[in-house]
Amino acid sequence: MEDKSKQCLQDPMCLGIESKHYIGSHGRHQVDFLEEMVDPGEISLDSLIFQRPEDEVSYQKKGGGPASSDNNELEKVLDSILDTSSSSHLHPWDDYVIPEFQEISVTSASSTKTLGDLTTDKKEAGVWTGTTAVENKSIPSLVPKEQDTLEYSIEGQLEGKGRRHGVLASRHPTLPPDGKMPMLPGSAVYLPGQPRHIEEDNDNYDQKHLSPYPCHSSCSHHDGKIKQEDSLYAEYGMPSSNPATPGPDPSLEYICKSETAAAYDNFRSTLGKSSDKAIPVLPTSSTTSQNLYQPLSLNDHQQNAYQSGTVNDAFVPQMHLSYEQYSRPDDPDQSSQYGFDALPRKICLICSDEASGCHYGALTCGSCKVFFKRAIEGQHNYLCAGRNDCIGDKIRRKNCPSCRLKKCCQAGMVLGGRKFKKYNRLKPGRELDRIATSSPMECQQALTRRVSNSSAQEVQYFPELLQILQSIEPEVLYAGYDYTKPETPSALLCSLNQLCERQLLCVVKWSKSLPGFRNMHIDDQIILLQYSWMSLMVFAMGWRSYKHVSGQMLYFAPDLVLNERRMKDSSFYSLCIAMRQLPQEFVKLQISQEEFLCMKALLLLNTIPLEGLKSQSYFDEMRSNYIRELAKAISLRHKGVVASSQRFYHLTKVLDSMHELVKQLHLYCLNTFLQSRALSVEFPEMMTEVISAQLPKILAGMAKPLIFHKK
């Protein structure tokens, strides 16, 4: 046997076969084999990856394998080489192995490592083709003479199921022809695709083989058939490939699936065809091997053998395209489907958590929805331990229920209010667009239907916010007037100043509880109070005069009511007549309590500095909200668009008339303050501060009154 092998090694015609199928006993002639092998410098790992399918196909046509007389000898040689009891062949292999092969380790069947463990090594060693079951203990086919190949076999411990073979091919590094690029894992061209389902024959064994090479499954591994799935192509808008028509290799469809249809079609059109156009490759800076495949399930068993590999950039024709081709298109259809604007983020208006929809009239999360419902139905009297400005974010929303409930009311949440659809199902403006494009008669009917529906719903919507305004309404204070002393103009003014001092404290407390007021800048809050304190107190006095004495007298306090005689005896009779017109107007219009509360809140926001406020935008929004609340309060008792509009006009005219009345009161108050010593009139400390700070500026025209109707 040794003579035959040596004689064949000297024959140039037999050199190719003998160098690939080494014959010896216990690895004695591996040194001779490596000495006769091709120059190791001409072998690279990249050349090991590529296999020429035409060579394997042509080899199968030749009949596969050497003469039958050598089969027994080759089988003995393989048994002697892979004999685990003897390690004589391992030492020469480790000594004379090519440096490029040192990173590839081979373990025996008794070792605990598997081929999957070897291939998942982080080093870029090569690509294992996996394991396959060989039927009827067939001996592996010899590689044709045209290839310089090293083949080794690992004897498995599967009794009656043949042997498991691993093939590691080595050739000269030659560039594959155009259009014949094998589809390999690890290349930057490909993106990880979804694993395909494997259809297996009942005659096959449990362990199947999946090769990453496009041609490998058709050449030697007929036991794994790829199942075509049309649904995967339908997701990308591409028709399923027809196996009857010639085209690219079908294994491409199981190896990878590109992210975009354009790139996928480019690869499919160029694969397997000679083309001068280079295959576009996405730019990448990755140098490490990546596992591009997920575990496949074969026969309901988990397959843990991952396949990975890298390829040299020299073997992949690259064309670095501009990043504009990979950017999001400007097409509105595509941008709405794949862009971020198609997925708007929904934020809770109360705690900034992710909102689940519109609950009780506001976009909130489920937690704030349940909290508001329980707080309103339970009628809890929450008190804030701080200054009514606690932070109510997602983490600290449960710390202060009082501030959380206040934010719910500020956001417009009302129990029993209008139920909106889910936020992600809303189609804003769709109904209005349909109304705008309809006929005039249909437009009028639709608007009438919308107004009637909204009126019926607002009857249930508004009272909950009114409940807040009613709860923060100050109590009626007593003046403490002493009727035992003789009534003089100075004594009356001193009693009114003491009453205004206490009422001013109530106004400050009321404004701090008013929804939305504390969210403004602190300087804006002070300025608004200094501008509106007089109008707020006079307006409240007019409401008491309307409710208690039907507008015939001035009801400053339960113990201080000025009738016609006492008005004439006072030093400000003309002002009393002007102030009495306010409750008389209330009697004429029959102002409801809901309307009064909304109008009073608007009086706080009725005058601003000429230069504006620091939080002017928020002030404008808050004022607009209370104007809308006034319109809702009007709709409670006045149905129809015409009646509501007329009612709104009259009420806003009353608010505009307050500017002239308050201006007269400011002028009289400032003159009395300047002559307080001569008139023997006392002014409390807070009254003194407010009058001296802002009244001169207001009378000098440095304040801007906000009016609804121009004169």
Curated annotation (Swiss-Prot):
Disulfide bonds: none annotated. It is found in: Nucleus. One of its GO terms (molecular function) is nuclear steroid receptor activity. SUPFAM superfamilies: Glucocorticoid receptor-like (DNA-binding domain), Nuclear receptor ligand-binding domain. Residues 1-347 are annotated as: Modulating, Pro-Rich. Expressed in all tissues examined: highly expressed in testis and brain. Also expressed in heart, lung, liver, kidney, stomach and small intestine. Keywords: DNA-binding, Lipid-binding, Metal-binding, Nucleus, Receptor, Steroid-binding, Transcription, Transcription regulation, Zinc, Zinc-finger. Transmembrane segments: none annotated. The keyword Transcription regulation applies. A zinc finger (NR C4-type) spans 348-368, 384-408. Its main location: nucleus. GO terms for cellular component: nucleus. Residues 348-420 bind DNA. Residues 457-691 form the NR LBD domain. Composed of three domains: a modulating N-terminal domain, a DNA-binding domain and a C-terminal ligand-binding domain. Belongs to the nuclear hormone receptor family. NR3 subfamily. This is Progesterone receptor. It comes from Rana dybowskii.
